[in-house]
């Protein structure tokens, strides 16, 4: 996406205190960065998605109401864990961080790092959660390849060690079987 | 060429639960790194390995006939994966199974072996349906 196309790409977040110009700049910046960006109210209801979110997931704010979006978006193996982690952050105000798989519009899953921080008012009450989802599919693949390579290497070393032990054992047996040698 | 197009569709098989019959069949040698292995040995020269029940045939171009011997699947509790015992008149060696990948329909397989000499070999198998 060309940055020049972004000015009116996604709706600006609703913030009655912010000027229209500021809201437009926020939306421009949020659409420019490579992450999916979202904002929720203190109870976890979404109030803003950037254009990348909408383009990747196919869900805009209107479609995000209710449980369907998360049930459809999240990989079935990640849904329970995601609910628990997000629920913990909402209940405690702790920073949110999780790796999970999101389904794209085309039906394929990719790994994302979801992170969010609460924004608080002067009294320390949470007024909103600001979150991003960073595509880590390639890093996950690299990590899995590295883990597989390490596991292979470990197995090879063990295999060669056992082979060497067998050879030493056979050699000792041959020497022991030779008459005149102790 | 069709096989290579499909290689992305091959799935890793858990080597701790690998059925022995997944290793049998007629394998093409796709690639090989000799390392310390004798380059003139039958397995170093082979372009095709037939792992039939109880019988091993190592075929190499330029040789009048395939080297014939036996093979067997071995397991050691210290290793988390099986290894193969190859017995040929000119060569007796073991090879660790480092990876086995198969298509969902079992028609295509890719087998990686690591020999005691350090030789690494990738074998491929395709069973196209007969028309």
Question: Residue spans of the language-model regions?
Answer:
Chain A
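PAS-associated C-terminal cap
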Residues: 1-25, 77, 134-148, 153-164, ...
């Amino acid at each position: 996406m060309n940055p020049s196309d972004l000015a009116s790409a996604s709706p600006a977040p609703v913030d009655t205190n912010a000027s229209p110009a500021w809201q437009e700049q926020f939306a421009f910046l949020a659409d420019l960065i490579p992450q999916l960006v979202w904002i929720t109210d203190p109870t976890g209801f979404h109030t803003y998605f950037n254009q990348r979110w909408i383009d990747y997931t196919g869900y805009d704010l209107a479609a995000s109401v209710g449980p369907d979006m998360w049930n459809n978006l999240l990989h079935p193996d990640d849904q329970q864990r995601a609910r628990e982690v997000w629920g913990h952050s909402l209940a405690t105000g702790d920073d949110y961080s999780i790796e999970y798989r999101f389904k794209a519009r085309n039906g394929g899953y990719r790994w994302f790092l979801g992170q969010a921080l609460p924004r608080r008012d002067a009294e320390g009450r949470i007024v909103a959660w600001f979150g991003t989802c960073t595509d880590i599919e390639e890093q996950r693949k690299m990590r899995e390849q590295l883990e597989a390579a390490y596991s292979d290497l470990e197995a090879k070393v063990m295999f060669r060690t056992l082979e060497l032990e067998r050879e030493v054992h056979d050699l000792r047996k041959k020497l022991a079987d030779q008459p005149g040698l102790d | 060429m069709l096989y290579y197009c499909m290689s992305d569709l091959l799935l890793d098989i858990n080597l701790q639960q690998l059925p022995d019959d997944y290793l049998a069949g007629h394998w093409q040698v796709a690639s090989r790194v000799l390392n310390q292995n004798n380059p003139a040995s039958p397995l170093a020269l082979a372009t095709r390995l037939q792992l039939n029940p109880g019988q091993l045939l190592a075929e190499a171009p330029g040789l009048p006939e395939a080297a014939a011997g036996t093979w067997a699947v071995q397991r050691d509790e210290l290793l988390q994966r099986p290894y193969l015992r190859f017995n040929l008149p000119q060569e007796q060696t073991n090879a660790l199974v480092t990876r086995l990948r198969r298509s969902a329909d079992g028609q295509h397989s890719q087998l990686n072996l690591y020999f005691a000499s350090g030789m690494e070999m990738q074998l491929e198998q395709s069973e196209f349906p007969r028309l």
